[in-house]
Curated annotation (Swiss-Prot):
CC terms in the record's Gene Ontology section: centrosome; nuclear envelope; nucleolus; nucleoplasm
PROSITE patterns: BRCT
Loss of function: phenotype: Mutants lacking the DEED domain form multinucleated cells.
Biased composition, class Polar residues, residue ranges: 1-10, 95-113, 514-529, 668-691
Residue ranges, compositional bias (Low complexity): 16-66, 75-94, 285-298, 364-401, 422-432
Protein known as: Nucleomorphin
UniProt cross-references to InterPro entries, sorted A to Z: ARM-type_fold, BRCT_dom, BRCT_dom_sf
Length: 756
C-alpha cells in the first residue's frame, strides 16, 4: 500500500532506499523506522493545539454566551479542525485511511478534499484493499473471518497473519478494549486497526466497503488512555444511490478514536460535503457544561438556538444542584401527618389481636406515638416554610425528596414496631402469608391462567394452611364413598358373568403373588367362581381380554348356526305340509346329502380350530404358571368336554334336519341309548378326532358320508321316495280354483273384443 509522508520522512525513505538493494524490505524497514519520529511530531502539535483550546474554553466560560461569541468559537474550532486534519493526513500510519472503490468520481472527490484542506499530501489511494496485508484478531468469529478474507482477496488484497508484514489489523470492539496480543503488537508497530462492528455490513453485501463507515485508529497518541468512541459518536451516513454499474459513489471520511481523557478529547475531522447530514450529540454532563467544539463550518440559525437552550439548561442544572444539598437535609427531617397516621393505624391493627393475649402493652406505644405526632406537627410547620422557599426546584429534586421521605417512613415504622414486639413474629408471618394467599388467588382468577398453574397454586395454598393448622390435613383427605364397591367384589361379579356363558369352562389361574382362588363348578353350563384374593398382572389382563374376544366370537357363530338350523327346520316342515316332491329324483337326494355334508364339515372344522387354539393357549399357560396345584388345570375346552358336546350336537341336528315319516319316526337318541352308544358314525368320528387331533380331514369326510348313507334317515328317504313315485299327482284345491277363475276372466275378456 503506497503511503504518503511529510517532507522529513521522505528524505529518510530516500536514504534507506539508496543503502539497500531490495525495495520491498526497504519499504518495510522505512515504515517501521519512521513511525516514532512522526509520532513525536504529531504529539507535539496536538499538545500545542490542546493548550490553545483550554485557554479559549476558560475565556468563554467566564463570559456569557451570545450568538456572536458562539460564531467566533465556531470559527476558531473550525481552524483547529483544519489543522488537525492536515496533521492526520500527513501521518498516514497514525490512522487516516479511507475506503472507496477505484473510480474516476472518487478521485475527483479526493482532489476536492485536498483543495479544501490546503494540503497536497492529503490525497490518498482510492482503494484501501489494494496490496493490503491484514491481520484478523482472534476475537472475530471464524465464519465472519472467512467472509472478510474472501471480500478482501476478491478486491486485490493479500492476507497476512504476522504483524511484522501487515498494514492493518481487523478486530472487535471487545478485543480492542481488552488489548489482545494482536492489538498490543499493532499498537507497538503503529498499524491501523479496523473494528469489525463498522465493517460487518460489507460482509453481508458481499461487496467492497461502501457508504458504511469503518473505524480507523490512531493509536500512537496516548496508548495508555485509549478509549473507543461509542456508535452514537461516530458519523454514519445513510446509503447513497448506487449507480447502474454496481459501484458505490462515496466521499472520503477520516475517522479517529478517543485517545485522550474526557476533558481533552480530540476533534473529529469532518468534510463540508458531509456536514449537512450530521447532528451534534451529547455524551456526558462535563461535555454539556463545556461549549461544544465539534460543530459544522456553516451553522444554521435553528442550531444556534438549540445551543443557547442547552447552555440555559446547563445553568439551570447547576443552580438546581446547589439547592439539592439543602433540600435533602431539610426533607430528611420532615414527614406528613397523613403518612404518619396511616403507619400508626397499620401498626395498631397488627398489635390488636396480640393485646388480647396480654403479650403487648400499648401504653408505651401510645406515649411514643403522641411524642411522634407532636414532633411531626413541628416538622410540618417547618416543612411548609421550606416548601414556600423551594417552589422553583426542578422535578429531579422532588423525586429525591420522595425517596428520602420513603426512607424516613421506613425508619419510623421500624422504631414503632420495635417497642415490646417480642412475640410478634407469628402475627407478621400470618399477615405475609395472607398477602401471599391473596396474590395467588388474584393470579388464579385471571382468564389466561392454565390448569397446571392453578393446581400448583392450590397445592401451595394447602401447604401453607397445613403448616399453620396441621388439623387441616386430616380434614382435607379424601374419604371413601359409602356405596363404593371393592376390587374383589367387582372381580367376582365379573367372573360370575363370564362363567354363565354357554359352552365354555372357566378357571382361575393361580400365581404366587397374584391369585389365591377356589373355583367351584356347579354342573351344566352354569359355572361360578369364588375369589378370595386377586391381583392383576399385565400378562393376565392381556390373556383375559383375548379369552373374552374369543368367547364373544364363538357366541356369535353359535347364534348364527342356530338361526340357520331353525330356517332349515322351518323349510323342511313347510315342504312336508305343502309339497312332497323334494325327493322325486336321485339328484335331489344327492344335493341334500352334499349340503348336509358341507354343513357338518364346516362345523367340525370350526370345532377343530377352536380345539387347536385352546391347546396352544393351554400349553402357554402351563409354561407361564409356577403354581403346584393338585388338580390339572387346562383351558376351557377339554377333550372329554368337546367330544360330549359334538355327540350331543350331532344327535340334535340329525333329529331336527332329517324329515321322517310319522309311521317310522324314531329318535336317534333312543337308538343311540339302545345300541349302548356303539353307533358306528359317532364312534368313527370320535376315533378320528382323538387320534388325528384335527389333522386328517379326509378320514372325517369319509366317515361323515358313510354315517349319512348308513343311517336310518337314508332308508326312510328311500322308502318315502318309492311311495311318492306310486301316488298320482294332484294339485291342491286352492290352485285349481285359482286356475279356473283366471280362465273365466280371460275368456270373458276375449269374448268382449269386437270381431273383425
Amino acid at each position: 500500500m503506497d503511503l504518503d509522508y511529510s517532507s522529513d520522512n521522505s528524505r529518510l525513505v530516500a536514504d534507506n532506499q539508496n543503502n539497500k538493494t531490495n525495495t520491498k524490505n526497504q519499504s518495510q524497514l522505512s515504515t517501521s523506522s519512521q513511525i516514532p519520529q512522526t509520532s513525536q511530531s504529531y504529539q507535539q502539535q496536538q499538545q500545542h493545539n490542546q493548550q490553545q483550546q483550554q485557554q479559549q474554553q476558560q475565556k468563554q466560560n467566564s463570559r456569557p454566551s451570545s450568538p456572536k461569541t458562539i460564531q467566533a468559537k465556531v470559527n476558531n474550532n473550525n481552524n483547529n479542525n483544519n489543522n488537525n486534519n492536515n496533521n492526520n493526513n500527513n501521518n498516514n500510519n497514525n490512522g487516516a485511511t479511507i475506503s472507496h472503490p477505484p473510480t474516476s468520481q472518487s478521485n475527483e472527490d479526493l482532489s476536492s478534499s485536498a483543495e479544501i484542506h490546503h494540503d497536497d499530501s492529503a490525497q490518498l489511494n482510492s482503494n484501501i484493499f489494494e496490496n493490503l496485508g491484514f491481520v484478523i484478531d482472534i476475537t472475530i468469529n471464524l465464519k465472519r473471518k472467512m467472509e472478510l478474507v474472501k471480500i478482501i482477496k476478491k478486491n486485490g488484497g493479500k492476507s497476512c497473519y504476522s504483524c511484522t508484514k501487515a498494514t492493518h489489523l481487523i478486530t472487535t470492539k471487545q478485543g480492542y478494549l481488552e488489548k489482545t496480543q494482536k492489538v498490543t503488537q499493532a499498537i507497538s508497530l503503529g498499524i491501523p486497526i479496523l473494528v469489525k462492528e463498522y465493517v460487518h455490513y460489507c460482509a453481508f453485501k458481499k461487496e467492497l466497503l461502501g457508504v458504511e463507515n469503518y473505524l480507523v485508529s490512531s493509536l500512537i497518541l496516548n496508548p495508555t488512555s485509549t478509549t473507543l468512541n461509542s456508535s452514537q459518536d461516530l458519523i454514519e451516513k445513510p446509503n447513497e444511490e448506487e449507480p447502474q454499474n454496481g459501484t458505490i459513489n462515496e466521499q472520503p471520511i477520516a475517522m479517529t478514536i478517543d485517545n485522550t481523557l474526557e476533558s481533552n478529547k480530540p476533534i473529529e475531522t469532518i468534510q463540508p460535503s458531509s456536514l449537512e447530514k450530521q447532528e451534534p450529540k451529547e455524551t456526558e454532563l462535563q461535555t454539556q457544561q463545556q461549549p461544544q467544539t465539534e460543530l459544522k463550518s456553516e451553522l444554521e440559525p435553528q442550531q444556534l438556538q438549540l445551543i443557547q437552550e442547552k447552555d440555559k439548561n446547563i445553568n439551570n442544572l447547576s443552580i438546581d444542584s446547589n439547592h439539592m444539598d439543602t433540600s435533602k437535609i431539610e426533607a430528611g427531617n420532615n414527614i406528613s401527618n397523613q403518612t404518619q397516621s396511616n403507619i400508626i393505624s397499620s401498626v395498631v391493627q397488627t398489635i390488636e389481636p396480640l393485646k388480647e393475649c396480654n403479650k403487648i402493652d400499648l401504653d408505651n406505644n401510645n406515649n411514643n406515638n403522641n411524642n411522634n405526632n407532636n414532633n411531626n406537627n413541628n416538622n410540618n410547620n417547618n416543612n411548609n416554610n421550606n416548601n414556600n422557599n423551594n417552589n422553583n426546584n426542578s422535578s429531579s429534586n422532588n423525586k429525591n425528596k420522595n425517596n428520602v421521605d420513603e426512607a424516613q417512613e421506613g425508619l419510623n415504622i421500624n422504631s414503632v414496631m420495635d417497642v415490646h414486639l417480642t412475640s410478634s413474629t407469628s402475627s407478621t408471618l400470618s399477615s405475609s402469608d395472607n398477602q401471599d394467599n391473596e396474590l395467588l388467588r388474584d393470579e388464579g382468577t385471571t382468564p389466561k391462567s392454565k390448569k397446571k398453574f392453578s393446581q400448583k397454586k392450590n397445592h401451595l395454598l394447602n401447604l401453607k394452611k397445613s403448616y399453620q393448622d396441621p388439623e387441616i390435613i386430616a380434614h382435607s383427605r379424601p374419604r371413601k364413598s359409602s356405596g363404593g364397591v371393592s376390587l374383589v367384589e367387582a372381580l367376582s361379579d365379573h367372573a360370575n358373568y363370564i362363567s354363565n356363558l354357554d359352552g365354555f369352562k372357566y378357571y382361575a389361574r393361580a400365581n404366587k403373588s397374584s391369585l389365591n382362588s377356589n373355583a367351584t363348578t356347579s354342573g351344566g353350563n352354569n359355572r361360578s367362581i369364588k375369589l378370595n384374593e386377586y391381583k392383576y398382572d399385565d400378562e393376565e389382563e392381556d390373556e383375559e381380554d383375548e379369552d373374552e374376544e374369543d368367547e364373544e366370537e364363538d357366541e356369535e357363530e353359535e347364534e348364527e348356526e342356530e338361526e340357520e338350523e331353525e330356517d332349515y327346520d322351518d323349510e323342511d316342515l313347510n315342504d312336508e305340509e305343502s309339497d312332497e316332491d323334494d325327493f322325486d329324483s336321485d339328484e335331489d337326494v344327492s344335493r341334500f346329502i352334499k349340503g348336509k355334508l358341507l354343513q357338518k364339515q364346516q362345523k367340525i372344522y370350526k370345532d377343530l380350530e377352536r380345539f387347536e387354539h385352546s391347546r396352544q393357549q393351554q400349553h402357554h399357560h402351563h409354561q407361564s404358571s409356577q403354581v403346584n396345584s393338585s388338580k390339572p388345570r387346562s383351558r376351557s375346552h377339554s377333550r372329554d368336554y368337546i367330544e360330549s358336546e359334538i355327540a350331543k350336537y350331532l344327535l340334535n341336528n340329525s333329529e331336527k334336519q332329517i324329515p321322517l315319516s310319522p309311521t317310522k319316526k324314531r329318535s336317534l337318541s333312543n337308538q343311540f341309548h339302545q345300541d349302548g352308544g356303539n353307533n358306528t358314525t359317532d364312534g368313527n368320528l370320535f376315533n378320528n378326532f382323538s387320534t388325528n387331533g384335527g389333522g386328517n380331514r379326509t378320514n372325517i369326510d369319509d366317515s361323515i358320508k358313510q354315517s349319512i348313507l348308513e343311517s336310518p334317515s337314508s332308508s326312510s328317504l328311500k322308502s318315502s321316495k318309492s311311495k311318492k313315485s306310486k301316488k298320482p299327482f294332484l294339485p291342491p284345491l286352492s290352485t285349481l280354483v285359482h286356475i279356473l277363475v283366471t280362465f273365466i276372466i280371460l275368456s270373458a275378456f276375449f269374448m268382449s273384443l269386437p270381431s273383425n
